[in-house]
Curated annotation (Swiss-Prot):
Its main location: cytoplasm. This is Phosphoribosylformylglycinamidine synthase subunit PurL. One of its GO terms (biological process) is 'de novo' IMP biosynthetic process. The keyword Protein biosynthesis does not apply.
């Protein structure tokens, strides 16, 4: 088949700027052919190259005594002791999920699972952070149903528990939903597999499902804004098969145990192109591929299509040649394709042969480590300090408004569609703060959470970035876990706009400061830019996934409030209402500055919770909705009423940071008061547990009525 002639329209469709296309010509000393241009386009787009963000990502703290592998591999790796490690990452699948919600979300789950088991880890937990447009928008209902069904359909069939996540709604996501998928797995520290190729003349092997035309150009699509041609992009969305992925997992882990693997990489964005280039570049080698050997499921596929297909459930491996027969037998047993499709070469070349013709001959390093990198112009965000006065409200009426909001009501309708008990090690399920999974066969457990408050980030990117990390830290602490490390998923608009780039730079600064202060280095992550439709961008959404360790199940804080318990508030309360849930849901306002984060207080207060866990009955952190919403959540979980002593609006609904609400016995409360005094931690009695109502000052409502609103609001809207 004759390749298309390169035209200006084709160059533009591949996402090249004039300068970038000129640079390609300069590198080659000639114009690229169609296949070569597709390869350069895939590797130089934002999704694969991080060309607009690399400069700033390098400033993040990525090291620590617990870190085995930081950013740059398929996933981050953190030591959890006893010769074991946790492997984890969060990644976006935003653009595909908006175009084709079910498959976009499903393949997002599949892709992040492969990132984990490619490293030699068996997946043990999944989470997702989902952002949708306003409820009344005509597309929101379809997106919610499709995405939730896609996440559940893939994860449930694969057999990994989905143990937590977030769901939010805001008009800024009307034209771009966000689907951020997280996965974690367990591995032995001496059995980790990396992607860098080594050895000249080693066979390059294709593993897994066959290649089709689905997803061709997906990475390029994910690096561009949406416009009125969005429906034309549907063929760029991948199609997933979770049962094939399950077989691929088992075959891959069995293959690794055989000793046949030199290096291995999953095929994700840009498919065969990106996996081969990354393996060669990291190993300082070239790669020659023979596409005639690639297993295909569609007739007459071109070299361009095979190189850029993003068909799912595929891996690429550099194999020990003497164990080829052993490796082939394993994959044939699992009814998966196994094909030697190339070899490593000493030259810095990426050579593609198809039907006996050389379809591409490119300098491999120019596609990866020496790809373009930009220092985009940026302007700092001017923090929004001005805020109109906030009227006093009836606290129960305001609380009821929050409980009915899709942003703060129960997500039961969502997580009931996810299997969160498969594998039998789930200790704390969705809806109870951080998810907790036992390390199988041990007395240890791992806690997982994902957090961000986009309103804060828009108002003040630095403080919003800090707060995302701090809230993740608090969620882990509230279940008794010691926070270990984080992964970031940076979702932003068009980086060519200085104000958007300024949001990104500010958020990175805040995240870096918080991770450094809280000893939670960033070990993996993902950047998703150009989340805009017709020039309108999303709220800046730097999602933080975090992992914590419970060295013993005795460390777990998993109790509930009981009749007669005292309520204690840890941390300073100053009544910060700027950018609060109260303003957004009750007054339809988003004004004022984001709450500022005292990282020293976060560390002290978190250490206090963990050091005194034996005195704590129930614990939750304070975030959206402040003390009032936290108190309701404690009451709802216990099925027992609560009386709060305070009654003014700012104290009840302010969102000051570094705070926890504790329920415990009177004697334990006295012991905690003494310990807090010694530690220099603010601690105050704010109420008591008992009865069947929620009482706040002079306002009161039956807990059963409030719980019904909270429990049913989401399903009433979306079921």
């Amino acid at each position: 088949m004759t390749e298309p002639t390169i035209t200006d329209d084709i160059i533009k469709a591949h996402g090249f700027t004039d300068d970038e296309y000129a640079e390609v010509n300069k590198i080659l000393g000639r114009a690229p052919n169609y296949t070569e241009m597709g390869i350069f386009s895939a590797m130089w787009n934002e999704h694969c190259s991080y060309k607009s963000s690399k400069k700033w990502l390098r400033t993040l703290p990525t090291e620590g005594p617990q870190v085995i592998c930081g950013p740059g591999e398929n996933a981050g790796i953190v030591d959890i002791g006893d010769g074991q490690c946790v492997v984890f990452k969060m990644e976006s699948h935003n653009h595909p999920s908006y175009i084709e919600p079910y498959q976009g979300a499903a393949t997002g789950v599949g892709g992040i699972l492969r990132d984990v088991f490619t490293m030699g880890a068996r997946p043990i937990a999944a989470m997702n952070s989902l952002s949708f447009g306003e409820v009344a928008h005509p597309k929101t209902r379809q997106l919610v149903h499709g995405v939730v069904e896609g996440v559940g359909g893939y994860g449930n069939c694969f057999g990994v528990p989905t143990i937590g996540g977030e769901v939010r709604f805001h008009p800024a996501y009307n034209g771009n939903c966000l689907v951020n998928a997280f996965a974690a797995g367990l591995a032995d520290t001496d059995k980790i597999f990396y992607s860098a190729a080594s050895g000249v003349g080693m066979p390059v092997v294709y593993l897994g499902a066959k290649t089709g035309r689905d997803g061709v150009g997906g990475a390029t699509m994910a690096s561009a804004e949406f416009d009125d041609t969005i429906e034309e992009k549907r063929p760029t969305v991948q199609v997933g098969d979770p049962f094939t992925e399950k077989r691929l997992l088992e075959a891959t882990l069995e293959l690794m145990a055989s000793g046949a693997v030199i290096s291995i990489q999953d095929m994700g964005a840009a498919g065969l192109t990106c996996s081969a280039v990354e393996m060669g570049d990291k190993g300082g080698l070239g790669i020659r591929l023979n596409l005639d050997a690639v297993p295909i499921r569609e007739d007459a596929m071109t070299a361009y299509e095979m190189m850029l297909s993003e068909s799912q459930e595929r891996m690429l491996m550099v194999l020990k040649p003497e164990l080829e027969d052993t490796a082939r037998a394993i994959f044939e047993k699992w009814d998966l394709d196994f094909a030697v499709v190339g070899e490593t070469i000493p030259e810095d070349r990426f050579v593609i042969v198809h039907n006996g013709e050389t379809k591409a001959d490119l300098p491999l390093s120019k596609l990866a480590s020496t790809a373009p990198e930009y220092d985009r112009p940026w302007v700092p965000t001017d923090p929004a300090h001005d805020m109109d006065a906030v009227p006093e409200v009836d606290p129960i009426d305001a609380l009821r408004a929050l409980l009915f909001s899709p942003n703060y009501c129960s997500r039961q309708w969502v997580y009931q569609q996810y299997d969160h008990q498969v594998m039998g090690d789930t200790v704390m399920s969705p809806g109870l703060g951080a998810g907790v999974v036992r390390v199988h066969g041990t007395d240890k457990a791992l806690a997982f959470t994902s957090d961000v408050t986009p309103r804060y980030v828009k108002a003040n990117p630095v403080e919003g970035g800090k707060q995302a990390v701090a809230e993740a830290y608090r969620n882990l602490t509230a279940v008794g876990a010691k926070p270990l490390a984080t992964t970031d998923n940076m979702n932003f608009g068009n980086p060519e706009k200085p104000e958007i780039m300024g949001q990104f730079v500010g958020a990175i600064k805040g995240i870096g400061e918080a991770c450094l202060a809280l000893d939670t280095p960033i070990v993996s992550g993902n950047v998703s830019l150009y989340n805009e439709t017709d020039g309108t961008g999303i709220l800046p959404t730097p999602t933080i996934g975090a992992v914590g360790l419970l060295s013993s199940m005795d460390d777990l804080i998993a109790g509930t409030a009981r009749d007669g318990h005292v309520l204690l508030l840890v941390g300073d309360t100053n009544g910060h209402l700027g950018q609060s849930a109260l303003l957004a849901e009750v007054f339809n306002r988003e004004d004022g500055d984001a709450p500022h984060v005292d990282l020293g207080a976060e560390k002290r207060n978190g250490d206090f919770i963990r050091d005194n866990r034996d005195w704590i009955g129930a614990c939750t952190d304070l975030s959206d909705g402040g003390l009032a919403l936290a108190a309701f959540e404690v009451a709802h979980a216990a099925g027992c009423g609560i009386t709060l002593d305070v009654g003014d609006t700012a104290t009840l609904f302010g969102e000051d940071q570094a705070r926890y609400l504790i329920s415990t016995s009177f004697d334990a409360a006295e012991a905690l008061m003494v310990a807090a005094g010694r530690a220099g931690v603010p601690l105050a009695t704010v109420g008591k547990v008992g009865g069947a109502s929620l009482r706040i000052g002079t306002s009161e409502a039956p807990l059963a009525d409030l719980s019904a609103t909270y429990t049913n609001a989401f399903s009433q809207t979306f079921a």
